[in-house]
Regions:
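Short coil/turn segments at alpha/beta junctions that flank glycine-rich nucleotide-binding fingerprints
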Residues: 8-12, 62-63, 84, 125
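Amphipathic, non-transmembrane alpha-helical scaffold segments
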Residues: 41, 45, 49, 101-112, ...
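All-alpha amphipathic helical-bundle segments outside canonical DNA-binding/catalytic cores
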Residues: 67-72, 103-107, 124-140, 158-165
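Helix-turn-helix
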Residues: 1, 5-39, 43
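Amphipathic C-terminal alpha-helical segment
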Residues: 80-83, 90-93, 117, 121, ...
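Hydrophobic alpha-helical bundle segments that form small-molecule/ligand-binding pockets
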Residues: 61-64, 109-137, 152-155, 175-178
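Hydrophobic alpha-helical connector segments
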Residues: 43, 54-83, 134, 138-141
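Short secondary-structure transition hinges
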Residues: 72, 78-117, 124, 152
Length: 178
């Protein structure tokens, strides 16, 4: 619920009193569990970043042809986004205004570099087109994936379990039938 409030009002505009009210706690009860509002932010960002980093550490991301590993990572990242939608939404909105946000942005950069290296490996193997810069391709792929936070609604008409497959299919295979 704290993450939803951060997403609704913005992290900087959300006070500890706002959080306590939304959670049905007193401020002192909230401080009993979390030392600061920034600690709540860190917990939320960890849910998103930890999930994304875990995808890169799975065997499907480390073994086999680079294009297969790329497909695995893109599908897995979409699955994390669906499972951790509020936390990933928050992650995509941080701007580096605090030490916690700066650390999160650095972890995102490392993740982005690892995905870019995977795209480059897939290009080198001939598994994906190589006439697009690997860093640009990685950013475009994640632009598609990250856009999900703007339109996907759990329980809506789009099947969250299938979403990763559909995004990767369009991103890597296109819309053409032939």
């Amino acid at each position: 619920m704290a993450v939803q409030l951060f997403n609704e009002q913005g992290y900087d505009a959300t006070s500890v009193a706002d959080l306590a009210r939304r959670l049905g706690l007193t401020k002192s009860a909230l401080y009993h569990h979390f030392a600061s509002k920034e600690e709540l932010l860190a917990v939320a960002l960890e849910a998103a970043l930890g999930g994304l980093e875990a995808v890169l550490d799975q065997p499907g991301a480390r073994e086999g042809a680079a294009s297969d590993r790329l497909r695995f990572v893109l599908t897995g990242a979409t699955d994390v986004l669906v499972a951790q939608l509020p936390a990933v939404t928050l992650l995509l909105r941080v701007r580096g205004n605090s030490a916690v946000e700066q650390a999160a942005l650095e972890r995102r950069r490392v993740f982005d570099h690892r995905v870019t290296a995977l795209v480059a490996a897939a290009q080198a193997e001939g598994g994906v087109r190589d006439d697009v810069d690997a860093a640009v391709a990685a950013r475009l792929l994640f632009g598609m994936i990250n856009s999900v936070v703007e339109w996907y609604r759990p329980g809506g008409s789009v099947d969250g379990d299938r979403l990763g497959h559909d995004i990767v299919r369009i991103a890597l295979d296109g819309l053409r039938t032939a």
